[in-house]
Amino acid sequence: MPELPEVETVKRGLAPSMEGRRLTRLELRRTDLRFPLPVDFAARTQGRLIVSLSRRAKYLLIDLDDGVSIVSHLGMSGSYRIEAANETGLPGQFHMARSRDEKHDHVIFHLSGPEGDPLRVIYNDPRRFGFMDMVERRHMDRHAAFAGLGPEPVGNALDADYLAFRFKGKAQPLKTALLDQKVIAGLGNIYVCEALWRAHLSPETPARALVNAEGKPVAALEDLTQAIRTVIAEAIEAGGSSLRDHIQADGSLGYFQHSFNVYDREGEACRTPGCTGTVERMTQAGRSTFHCPQCQR
């Protein structure tokens, strides 16, 4: 399932083509994805100006000029592509001429620019695990998808003092604690595995072990915080990771998977300089964890 870097990549790919354009028609080719589409979805969005594209955690937000945002979650296989009648006039660099299977084109945004030039943004989702909803931005924190979300692993909100506050007294394994979206929003399985490897921490370490008696972060928690921020920044720069069905808005694939140090590398040599260990896989809370038991302690 796409994590924060993948959704950020899609947002950046779509923004040049969608921002500042008017939504002349929302074409719905079915009434539901994972959940039913909003009541009067097409009617409520017709004629609205798209003022910006944004992101919260793993959700893409299409912000309209009436204070409402369209919430889009990509699920397991959701992707967007952009089509213009005049390809040479396509804004931005993101374009994919054809979907992999157009029978899975479920939602089509018909847009017009300042000069009336038409453009279509098409949501394709073979498995239909994604969903779309609408939310008033002023009440976004009340929406089920956003209520209680923690800070994101980008910007200045995430620091070691915050994690020490959340981890104090918590016996939960470190990896499980980091996957809690109420602790850090948008952080998923891939990047938790990678950050723990960079910080040389075992995914089974109790979260409370990184907090001292005074409730302050130990040095290892400082290292982990920096590792999280770094791995997310590098993944965004690389365009996310192309696992299973993730695809960027231009039809190309992300390439951070070529930088994986532990994720999906079971049985391969650890890449920590001087370490002779081998990457192993185990299951935690129903998810695969990849780690090096020799240098992650």
Curated annotation (Swiss-Prot):
Family (UniProt): Belongs to the FPG family.
InterPro entries with a match to the protein in the record: DNA_glyclase/AP_lyase_DNA-bd (IPR015886), Formamido-pyr_DNA_Glyclase (IPR020629), FPG_cat (IPR012319), MutM-like_N-ter (IPR035937), Ribosomal_uS13-like_H2TH (IPR010979), Znf_DNA_glyclase/AP_lyase (IPR000214)
Superkingdom of the organism of origin: Bacteria
Active site: P2, E3, K58, R287
A Pfam family the protein falls into: H2TH
Quaternary context: Monomer.
Biological function: Involved in base excision repair of DNA damaged by oxidation or by mutagenic agents. Acts as a DNA glycosylase that recognizes and removes damaged bases. Has a preference for oxidized purines, such as 7,8-dihydro-8-oxoguanine (8-oxoG). Has AP (apurinic/apyrimidinic) lyase activity and introduces nicks in the DNA strand. Cleaves the DNA backbone by beta-delta elimination to generate a single-strand break at the site of the removed base with both 3'- and 5'-phosphates.
EC number: 3.2.2.23, 4.2.99.18
Key word Manganese present: no
Positions annotated to bind DNA: H104, R127, K170
Species whose genome carries this gene: Allorhizobium ampelinum (strain ATCC BAA-846 / DSM 112012 / S4)
Cofactor: Zn(2+)
Zinc finger (FPG-type): 261-297
Name this protein carries in UniProt: Formamidopyrimidine-DNA glycosylase
A Gene Ontology molecular function term of the record: class I DNA-(apurinic or apyrimidinic site) endonuclease activity
Keywords for the protein's UniProt record, in alphabetical order: DNA damage, DNA repair, DNA-binding, Glycosidase, Hydrolase, Lyase, Metal-binding, Multifunctional enzyme, Zinc, Zinc-finger
Catalytic activity entry: Hydrolysis of DNA containing ring-opened 7-methylguanine residues, releasing 2,6-diamino-4-hydroxy-5-(N-methyl)formamidopyrimidine; 2'-deoxyribonucleotide-(2'-deoxyribose 5'-phosphate)-2'-deoxyribonucleotide-DNA = a 3'-end 2'-deoxyribonucleotide-(2,3-dehydro-2,3-deoxyribose 5'-phosphate)-DNA + a 5'-end 5'-phospho-2'-deoxyribonucleoside-DNA + H(+)
A GO BP entry: base-excision repair
Cofactor binding mode and count: Binds 1 zinc ion per subunit.
Cited Gene3D superfamilies: 1.10.8.50, MutM-like, N-terminal
